[in-house]
Curated annotation (Swiss-Prot):
The lineage of its organism: Eukaryota, Metazoa, Chordata, Craniata, Vertebrata. GO terms for cellular component: extracellular region; plasma membrane. This is Zinc metalloproteinase-disintegrin-like lachestatin-1. Glycans are attached at residue 312. Expressed by the venom gland.
């Protein structure tokens, strides 16, 4: 499973924000500023392409009336304020994985940008800020790719790190001869971060209609108006796709997809994806599309010897969740531990409504925080939890988990499996 995760194409759904100073700097012209922002994202996408990551601009916001935070020359303070605004405002109205602020302010010292290390997919920390420090947009793009690199688990390069160029993307200082290349150290650090954190949000491919930037033929992502995209003509190896137009070649029905073979749709009924487990189903081609639609068993079907119920193709049970949090010997705690979820305190609750934690009702205690007993000699506490203020949802009982006979968790409540949940 780890290898499958590492090999999977990743997608960073980005929202780029420009502050009021940027709006003034570019002559109060939204068109000029938007064009600069699009150009920056195109370069960032080019840089991350080598890491098997596609950066898709799903939101662009220009603060043309006034700033929504107090942008100041202290980069630390500005990053903190921007990240809080992202969590409390932007995330609530726009689904995305990462937000970057492009500012016209001059940060103190030599700082050109700042971001949280390994923050991707975390509501509070998937953010960065970058100073528009140069007229040449590709130099600003490299600085933003550097900050996103931090979000994706990469630290600054040491002297021993190499990428085959004079300077690599994660170099600690800005170079007058920058490159679009990540060093061997960056690649190792990014891989180690993916293995450790396994961030899930970047696995989800954005819809072509989610992308707000103008389509770019040659960026390996099929956008509105395109039928295929195999990169630039010089590097395209796809015989089904015309790289110059991003249209299918004459006679081709498709260029990619699990139900596409040699530019033609596979026949109806051809298996395109085997069932992963008892809650999954083998997926079949329709003969009319290149897509392999994911099907799974109905929610509520018993699984794992009646210890759980199928939920969206998985079988979530508490023991597996304890093992994921505390290691292979972990077990679910006694029922008494789950009574802490009646308190409605910072960790013991069932759900959040408008950022307020709601205590569990007695019948719902198994749908709040998960309590585990890690079977190690050093552990005396029978009611262990995983709680981090950075990611409060981690360590909660997963949706669809069996909470009683014939019942499963849904939005912090223990509901009948036969009702839609």
């Amino acid at each position: 499973e780890q290898q499958r995760y590492l090999n999977a194409k990743k997608y960073v759904k980005l929202v780029l924000v420009a502050d009021y100073i940027m709006y003034l700097k570019y002559g109060r012209s939204l068109t000029t500023l938007r064009t600069r922002m699009y150009d920056i994202v195109n370069i960032i996408n080019l840089i991350f392409q080598r890491m098997n990551i596609h950066v898709a601009l799903v939101g662009l916001e220009i603060w043309s009336n006034r700033d929504k935070i107090i942008v100041q020359s202290s980069a630390d303070v500005t990053l903190d304020l921007f990240a809080k605004w992202r969590e409390t405002d932007l995330l609530k109205r726009k689904s995305h994985d990462n937000a970057q602020l492009l500012t016209g302010i001059n940060f103190n010292g030599p700082t050109a940008g700042l971001a949280y290390l390994s923050g991707i997919c975390k509501p509070m920390y998937s953010a960065g800020i970058v100073q528009d420090h140069n007229k040449v947009h590709h130099l600003v793009a490299i600085a933003m790719a550097h900050e996103m690199g931090h979000n994706l688990g990469m630290d600054h390069d040491k002297d021993t790190c190499t990428c085959g160029a004079r300077s690599c993307v994660m170099a600690g200082t800005l170079s007058c001869e920058p490159s679009y290349l990540f060093s061997d150290c960056s690649r190792r650090e990014h891989r180690a971060f993916l293995i450790k954190d396994m961030p899930q949000c970047i696995l989800e491919k954005p819809l072509r209609t989610d992308v707000v930037s103008p389509p770019v033929c040659g960026n390996y992502f099929v956008e509105v108006g395109e039928e295929c995209d195999c990169g630039f003509s010089a590097t395209c190896r796809d015989t089904c796709c015309d790289a110059a137009t991003c249209k299918l070649r004459q006679g081709a029905q498709c260029a990619e997809g699990l139900c596409c073979d040699q530019c033609r749709f596979k026949g109806a009924g051809t298996e395109c994806r085997a069932a992963k487990d008892e809650c999954d189903m083998a997926d079949l081609c329709t003969g009319r599309s290149a897509e392999c639609t994911d099907r799974f068993q109905r929610n509520g079907q018993p699984c794992q010897n009646n210890n759980g119920y199928c939920y969206n193709g998985t079988c979530p049970i508490m023991r597996d969740q304890c093992i994921a949090l505390f290691g292979p010997n972990a077990a679910v705690s006694q029922d008494a531990c789950f009574q802490f979820n009646l308190q409605g305190n910072h960790y013991g609750y069932c759900r959040k409504e408008q950022n307020t934690k709601i205590a569990c009702e007695p019948q719902d205690v198994k749908c709040g925080r998960l309590y585990c007993f890690p079977s190690s000699p050093a552990t005396k506490n029978p009611c262990n939890i995983h709680y981090s203020p950075n990611d409060e949802d981690k360590g909660m009982v997963l949706p669809g988990t069996k909470c009683a006979d014939g019942k499963a968790c849904s939005n912090g409540r223990c509901v009948d499996v036969n009702t839609p949940y």
